[in-house]
Amino acid sequence: MNAAIDCDDGNPMLRRVALEAIQAWKGRLGRIVEEGVERGEVRREVEPRRIANTIVATLEGALMVSRLEGNKVALEDARDSLEIALEGIAAR
């Protein structure tokens, strides 16, 4: 996360590495959601890209807050909230 933020300061190589890492992570998450849709485990109207972006943004933001506050409360809250959100996309 720090690398992703710092790369805006003009280090194109660092930006590329950080971008590739985030894109790979989001890609893996998106594929997991797509597979869930194909198996009938995830609702068909769910957009894998949106779920992947939401998971990554939530976890990265929670990590930043947890580091700043010096505790794991934000990470635990993010985990619990994502669990509820992911239960909400499950096929019924």
Language model segments and positions:
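C-terminal peripheral helix-coil segments that are non-catalytic and often amphipathic
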Residues: 23-39, 58, 68-92
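All-alpha amphipathic helical-bundle segments outside canonical DNA-binding/catalytic cores
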Residues: 16-21, 38-54, 73, 77
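Hydrophobic alpha-helical segments that form the core
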Residues: 44-64, 81-85
